[in-house]
A protein has these predicted regions:
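Extended, low-polarity segments enriched in aliphatic/aromatic residues
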Residues: 27-271
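N-terminal secretory signal peptides and thylakoid transit peptides that target proteins
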Residues: 1-18
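Small side chains
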Residues: 18-20, 72
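C-terminal segment of classical bacterial N-terminal signal peptides
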Residues: 22-25
């Protein structure tokens, strides 16, 4: 009997670079059969969803990570939406591919996720994430139609929240003992870094951990943010924190200023 794709199964294409979860109790009770899964898939075509499905199965299945939970997916949309590297679209070059996003949303929804929230802090932009995607030729309604409850949030500022939330760094951190983040990083049970494998002039390579550098809002960690309080809107990138200048007196003043910001301390999740 032929299988007919519904609207919520609209995109039968994708591959995932990395996944992490913040629900450790259930993880400990049901250990995965593997901690890493690697598969070859030659295109963003119809083979990607079954390939992804097998990979998630090798990791113990999506259900134990997402069923009944709110999932935060940090996308990699670094670089201008209008940039065309080698004449390629953003998704075929420096952004995570839109079909990858759609396929992951579809599979997580099928596995029982209660809510899926797509997250990104796009450089110095305060526009809704839907609008930022539109500038690259993406239609955000495709992602929202791939699951029962899908939301998008620009995490460069407060977004739909009223406060930034403080996340402590284990063992004190190297630059900051804690970070102030958008509410979406607290209001999730499972966190996923959906990265794009590419080279990077500062880090050398971008993978799942480097993708999380974009979690920090440029309203607080931007290069030209005021010393005494967060900006209302982002104005610049985070270059000062990703270069040797991070050890400079100016960066030290920024760290002292950020430490003094009042925020709700995050106690409900770990990284």
């Amino acid at each position: 009997m032929p299988h007919v794709l519904s609207r919520r199964q609209f995109i039968a294409t994708s591959a995932v670079a990395g996944i992490g979860a913040t629900r450790f109790a259930s993880w400990a009770r049901s250990a995965p059969s593997a901690t890493v899964s690697i598969a070859k898939c030659g295109s963003y075509g119809a083979d990607l969803v079954p390939t992804l499905d097998r990979m998630f199965g090798q990791l113990g299945g999506l259900g134990r990570l997402v069923q009944g939970r709110t999932v935060g997916i940090k996308l990699n949309l670094t670089g201008s939406p209008q940039l065309r590297l080698g004449g390629h679209s953003a998704g075929a070059a420096h952004w995570v591919h839109p079909r990858m996003v759609g396929a992951v949303v579809h599979l997580m929804d099928r596995a029982g996720a209660r809510r899926i929230r797509l997250l990104e802090s796009p450089y110095a932009s305060a526009v809704p994430l839907e609008e930022y995607m539109f500038q690259a030729g993406w239609d955000a309604s495709d992602f929202m139609g791939a699951g029962a409850r899908v939301e998008l949030e620009n995490t460069n500022g407060l977004g739909r929240g009223r406060d930034y939330h403080r996340f402590d760094v284990p063992k004190g951190g190297l630059l900051f003992p804690s970070y102030l983040l958008n509410h979406s990083f607290l209001d999730c049970d499972t966190f996923v870094s959906l990265a794009k494998l590419k080279d990077h002039m500062t880090a050398g390579v971008t993978l799942s951990m480097k993708n999380c550098f974009g979690n920090i809002p440029t309203t607080i960690y931007g290069d030209y943010v005021k010393q005494d309080e967060p900006d209302l809107a982002p104005r610049s990138g985070r270059g000062l924190l990703s270069t040797p200048e991070a050890a400079s007196p100016r960066a030290s003043r920024r760290r002292s200023s950020i430490r003094s910001h009042r925020a709700t301390r995050a106690t409900g999740c770990r990284a």
